[in-house]
Amino acid sequence: MEKAIVLLSAGLDSTVSLAYGVRNFQVVLGLTFNYGQKASRKEIEHSKKILDYYGIPQEVIELPFLKKITKTSLVAEDQEIPTGIDLESAAAVKTSMEKVWVPNRNGLFINIAAAYAESLGAKYIITGFNAEEAKTFSDNSREFVDAVNHALKYSTLNHVQVVSFTQNLEKSEIYRLGVELGAPLDLIWSCYYGGDEMCGVCESCLRLKRARGGN
């Protein structure tokens, strides 16, 4: 089996992509990032539980500078994350995206992961992108992955490549796939906040609720 590493936030997409990936690759490391996001503690904690479930070691990458230069509500303590938005409204979803956008976040994550992958002799980086959010988050899109993979052919000697087994799926399809794969869906954290429980009203929580069929 080819070696791979996984970028894991403990959300639905990355967890299910990992569940699929372990059937195809030898996953040797999980990377979780702390860039000052409000859910960082929960993402790290739940990612560790998911990685432990699969017997994969975790490394937490600290990126404090990203919080310093980012002004959006995902990290800024003086800004409220949008809640209760209408997921069927393109305008509302676009506004929500702009309020939680972190500059080049996925680009940074992937390039850091590529350095780890090459050093570990791994050819693949497993990520959790999806078709639903790619409509507003351009760094979830197939075009983004294709562009990054083109660049990685030049920046890594072993031509590390990004793969996402959820890339072409809507959230509801990803949830069903997770059930089929026996993914530890009880361990996921899909909330923008870091409270004791998921808030249930931020965009990420609303998408998870809809994916579950309203439950």
Curated annotation (Swiss-Prot):
One of its GO terms (molecular function) is ATP binding. Binds 1 zinc ion per subunit. Keywords: ATP-binding, Ligase, Metal-binding, Nucleotide-binding, Queuosine biosynthesis, Zinc. InterPro entries: QueC (IPR018317), Rossmann-like_a/b/a_fold (IPR014729). Its cofactor is Zn(2+). Pathway: Purine metabolism; 7-cyano-7-deazaguanine biosynthesis. Catalyzes the ATP-dependent conversion of 7-carboxy-7-deazaguanine (CDG) to 7-cyano-7-deazaguanine (preQ(0)). Belongs to the QueC family. This is 7-cyano-7-deazaguanine synthase. It comes from Carboxydothermus hydrogenoformans (strain ATCC BAA-161 / DSM 6008 / Z-2901). The gene is queC.
